[in-house]
């Protein structure tokens, strides 16, 4: 199969880097593939993407063939595992279900609602209201009781303390039984976790979310014939075909949607609906970073992080309802109860929800890096992406949020974690019969580029200060 190597080059917005080349000669081939526009990071960046020439529309501009492209084509799409055998037929015998973007219709298909997750979503806000009402009712009932009846109630409760203890023990036993019967093993990492809602139910629920997103983005969706859409689709196909050792990957019908928006975002719903924004395509440096990002997002869907996070949230919410009822029953005034309610919500958020979310993100980084390695991508580009995001945040003036306040790990922590995983990922990549990587490490190239920028800026500042000093001296001594 004839394949073309399309070089897409972006020029840096920083004038000090206009002469610095990171990968190849400055050139923009196949115009409008990525809308060659200024970038935020490195001066000259070349994208090497292999696309089947028969599937491309006729493009104006020059398309060059080069043997220097990193091969990610069908010749390397064999099944990759610890016992890898060369050749593509193994992958072809286990085809991946892959769907193109459907035409959007305002009247969606009618389907049965997934009962359990939807019921939980509807009842979740009502549970807190009922807990508040119950707590206030208990408080008002206790305040209205005469002193003698309060004393009788205390004596009655003390006489039946063993009944209460037995009831509490029974509830604890039921809760433990529920917990151990809902333990599940992560399909990729083998981690034991609590799973109240099944991944199947959440895939059904995700279809409603997908329809809502399609309605929201219907005016900005890029057609499947657009080269940017083809690039994302090609990367997803390679990731799916090269990771056939993951049983769940063939069970998900992957569907790609590219949204024309400057937002730097990409996400994958549990049912395999992939949404990538053009802002993310402009943010990545090369095809290797895009492979890592899509592998990270696909890992969320494959592991079932949405169902896992909702399960933990459900259990924490049930336990919080008991504490919430006690707060509104014990506090003498509604204002104090509202304050306690707010503190309780923040404690749950910062002690359970956000740390658990960061844990899932770190796991998706690990699995996504492994998937990218089996797809023959240069996994060393993964840490570079997060270093670029760190610089982007600094250049854009965005305030740096402490990690414990965020649902995601900090960029620096992600870089450190990926750097620890790179040697293992490179070994996995070598076992998958991938072509040898260039000796030049993109992490070294990026750090050198940053160093040159800083030195150039420092020299400019010194020259400016020296010039200002001479001007002031000339004014003082004409």
From Swiss-Prot:
Annotated compartments? Mitochondrion inner membrane
Q: How is the cofactor bound?
A: Binds 1 zinc ion per subunit.
Q: Which residues cross the membrane?
A: 163-183
Effect of disrupting the coding gene: Morpholino knockdown of the protein causes developmental defects, such as pericardial edema, smaller eyes and shorter body length. Bioenergetics defects are observed in dells.
**Residue pairs linked by disulfide bridges in the UniProt entry:** 376-434
Q: Does the keyword Transit peptide apply?
A: yes
Give the regulation of activity: Protease activity is activated upon autocatalytic cleavage in response to mitochondrial depolarization.
Q: Name one GO cellular component term.
A: mitochondrial inner membrane
What does the PTM comment state? Answer: Autocatalytically cleaved in response to mitochondrial depolarization both at the N-terminus and C-terminus to generate the short active form (S-OMA1). The S-OMA1 form is unstable. May form a redox-dependent disulfide bond. Exists in a semi-oxidized state and is activated by prolonged hypoxia.
Q: Name one GO biological process term.
A: mitochondrial respiratory chain complex assembly
What InterPro entries does its record include? Mito/Outer_Membr_Metalloprot, Peptidase_M48
Keyword rRNA processing attached: no
Q: Where does Zn(2+) bind?
A: 296, 300, 361
What positions does UniProt annotate as the active site of this protein?
297
Could you tell me one molecular function GO term of this UniProt entry?
A: metal ion binding
Cofactor(s) of this protein = Zn(2+)
Region Stress-sensor region, residue ranges:
134-164
Q: How does it sit in the membrane?
A: Single-pass membrane protein
Q: What Pfam families does the database record attribute to this sequence? A: Peptidase_M48
Per the similarity annotation, which family is this? Belongs to the peptidase M48 family.
Tell me, what does this protein do in biology?
Metalloprotease that is part of the quality control system in the inner membrane of mitochondria. Activated in response to various mitochondrial stress, leading to the proteolytic cleavage of target proteins, such as opa1 and dele1. Involved in the fusion of the mitochondrial inner membranes by mediating cleavage of opa1 at S1 position, generating the soluble opa1 (S-opa1), which cooperates with the membrane form (L-opa1) to coordinate the fusion of mitochondrial inner membranes.
Q: How does it assemble?
A: Homooligomer.
Protein name as annotated: Metalloendopeptidase OMA1, mitochondrial
Q: What is the species listed in this Swiss-Prot or TrEMBL entry?
A: Danio rerio
* Source lineage: Eukaryota, Metazoa, Chordata, Craniata, Vertebrata
């Amino acid at each position: 199969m004839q394949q073309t190597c399309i070089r897409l080059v972006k020029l840096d917005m920083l004038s000090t880097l206009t002469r610095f080349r990171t990968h190849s000669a400055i050139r923009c081939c196949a115009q409008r593939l990525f809308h060659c526009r200024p970038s935020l990071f490195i001066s000259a960046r070349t994208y090497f993407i292999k696309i089947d020439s028969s599937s491309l529309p006729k493009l104006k501009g020059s398309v060059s063939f080069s043997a220097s492209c990193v091969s990610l084509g069908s010749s390397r799409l064999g099944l990759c595992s610890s016992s890898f055998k060369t050749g593509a037929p193994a992958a072809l015998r286990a085809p991946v279900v892959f769907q193109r973007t459907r035409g959007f219709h305002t009247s969606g298909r009618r389907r049965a609602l997934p009962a359990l997750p939807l019921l939980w979503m509807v009842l979740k806000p009502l549970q807190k209201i009922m807990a508040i009402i119950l707590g206030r009712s208990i408080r008002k009932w206790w305040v209205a009781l005469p002193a003698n009846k309060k004393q009788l109630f205390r004596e009655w409760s003390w006489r039946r303390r063993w009944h209460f203890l037995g009831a509490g023990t029974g509830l604890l036993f039921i809760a433990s039984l529920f917990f151990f019967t809902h333990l599940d093993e992560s399909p990729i990492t083998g981690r034991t976790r609590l799973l109240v809602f099944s991944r199947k139910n959440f895939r059904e629920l995700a279809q409603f979310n997908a329809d809502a997103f399609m309605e929201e983005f219907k005016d900005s969706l890029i057609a499947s014939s657009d080269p940017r859409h083809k690039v994302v689709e090609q990367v997803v196909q390679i990731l799916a075909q090269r990771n056939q050792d993951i049983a769940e990957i063939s069970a998900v019908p992957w569907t790609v949607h590219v949204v024309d928006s400057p937002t730097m975002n990409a996400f994958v719903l549990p049912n395999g609906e992939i949404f990538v924004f053009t802002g993310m395509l402009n943010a990545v440096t090369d095809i290797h970073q895009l492979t890592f990002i899509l592998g990270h997002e696909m890992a969320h869907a494959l592991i079932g992080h949405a169902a896992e996070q909702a399960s933990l949230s459900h259990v924490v919410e049930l336990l919080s309802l008991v504490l919430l009822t006690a707060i509104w029953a014990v506090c003498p005034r509604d204002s104090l109860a509202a304050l306690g309610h707010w503190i309780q919500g923040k404690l749950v958020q910062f002690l359970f929800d956000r740390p658990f979310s960061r844990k899932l993100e770190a796991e998706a980084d690990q699995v996504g890096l492994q998937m990218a390695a089996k797809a023959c991508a240069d996994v060393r580009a993964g840490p570079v992406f997060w270093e670029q995001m760190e610089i982007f945040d600094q250049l854009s003036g965005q305030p740096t949020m402490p990690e414990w306040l965020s649902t995601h790990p900090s960029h620096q922590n992600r870089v450190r974690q990926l750097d620890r995983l790179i040697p293992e990922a490179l070994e996995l990549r070598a076992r998958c019969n991938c072509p040898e990587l260039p000796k030049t490490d993109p992490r070294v190239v990026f750090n050198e580029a940053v160093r040159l920028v800083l030195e150039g800026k420092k020299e400019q500042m010194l020259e400016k200060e020296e010039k200002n000093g001479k001007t002031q001296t000339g004014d003082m001594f004409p």
